[in-house]
Amino acid sequence: VGHGATRAALGLETAALGHSLDMANNNFFSHTGSDGQSVGYRATGAGYTWSSVGENIAAGLSLSSVSAVVQAWVGSPGHCANLMRSNYTEIGASKFSNPASNYNVYWTQVFGRPR
């Protein structure tokens, strides 16, 4: 993240993986989960107590490598803003693939600041 050291957080990692799995296994691409819930709900459900939370998602075979997805996020103003936002101090990220789904590869980054 663009403002200095950001550390990994297990709760954010769990929320990220859960959302990537949900999108891949239920064949959709959205910040809203198949249960209608938001990133904040997913982070809380994963045991993360937050004061600020945000999310980047990406999907598609053209984004199958870490370098490709990071390049896409940096090239997108909204996604890049999340990457550079100074109020986020922790991160969790995941990638999940399901060849039977429309996009095949699904990425989720969850950013947070603990309360």
Question: Residues of each region from the PLM?
Answer:
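A well-ordered secondary-structure block
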Residues: 38-115
